[in-house]
């Protein structure tokens, strides 16, 4: 056991990273890509506007935040090993087939499974510091800590 880091539940961390790419990444990408197209000049009319705040401002802030997160994802991927970069970009983001990715890496199926797990763990480690560098809020920790002796999950508090 490390003196600096809590012991990770690698399989749950891999699942969390995969879920991030399957569920969150595409939406972040769409939000980041739409940040400029959703903004329009305000139109003045005699009718009162709604009082729930400035929709254009909120859309801009959401787009900038999503853009920073996409930049952090790209930065984190660039810090990973070559095989991990190929897997993260082509298998998890572009949704290419396992066969295509195996051919790109010149490896067999069982080896690709191992490399995919390693890629997810590398990404989880690199993503923490990338979010800080890109001033993302909130910081999303993709790590899952192992259960303690009583079977409870330990809290996911890290000093970064």
Q: Which residues does each PLM region occupy?
A:
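N-terminal interaction/assembly modules
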Residues: 1-78, 99-100, 127-160
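Membrane-interacting alpha-helical segments
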Residues: 53, 110-113
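Helix-turn-helix DNA-binding module
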Residues: 94-111
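A short pre-motif secondary-structure segment
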Residues: 87-88
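DNA major-groove recognition helices of helix-turn-helix
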Residues: 112-130
């Amino acid at each position: 056991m490390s003196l600096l880091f809590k012991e990770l539940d690698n399989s749950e961390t891999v699942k969390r990273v995969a879920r991030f790419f399957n569920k969150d990444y595409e939406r972040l990408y769409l939000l980041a890509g739409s940040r400029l197209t959703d903004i329009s000049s305000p139109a003045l009319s005699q009718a009162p506007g709604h009082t729930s705040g400035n929709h254009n401002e909120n859309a801009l802030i959401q787009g900038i935040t999503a853009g920073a997160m996409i930049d952090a994802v790209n930065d984190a991927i660039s810090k990973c090993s070559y095989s991990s970069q190929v897997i993260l970009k082509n298998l998890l983001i572009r949704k290419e087939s396992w066969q295509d990715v195996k051919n790109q890496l010149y490896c067999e199926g069982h080896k690709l499974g191992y490399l995919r797990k390693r890629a997810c763990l590398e990404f989880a480690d690199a993503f923490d510091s990338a979010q800080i560098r890109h001033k993302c809020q909130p910081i999303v920790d993709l790590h899952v800590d192992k259960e303690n002796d009583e079977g409870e999950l330990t809290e996911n508090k890290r000093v970064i």
